Amino acid sequence: QLSQNQYSAFREHINYMIEADNHINLFEYTLHHVVRRHLDSAFSDENANVKSIRSLATVRVECNVLLSALVQAGHATESDRPTVFQAGIEELFTNADSAQYVSEVSLAKVDEALDVLVAVAPKIKRCIVKACVVCVVYDQYITVSEAELLRAVADSLGCPIPPIIASDNRL
């Protein structure tokens, strides 16, 4: 087991490796996020008093960001993205008309959204992951980027999914 100092050094080394080329790719983001989710709680009591969010409506903006990021990770054609996004939103909300596709989503924005969404009730988390899956499989083709981001999202929400094999073949 790591001491607090060893864990801090471990995190610093991971951050150094991730930032070495001044570009964070999706694999690096996923690694950082999974380590943060699983180990930070063991070395910090920061999340001990987090209240559960029980209304999906209160996290609509975060869901928009998350689904937009997944759509961008796997759908190269910009004209298709709003349609795929809408399919995911309709999985979550009965009134999906007010949902806004976010055309440019950074991994930092995804992190911010996940930091909020981690506090939603388990039933809502499952609904969010299901909407993410709808976006990923919409075109019956799963890219490596989509698979990695989906696994990071699901793991962050405490709803891990098995590894997905992305390929050049349609489902």
What are these regions (language model features)?
Residues Q1-E19, H23, F27-L171:
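Small-residue-enriched hydrophobic alpha-helices in membranes
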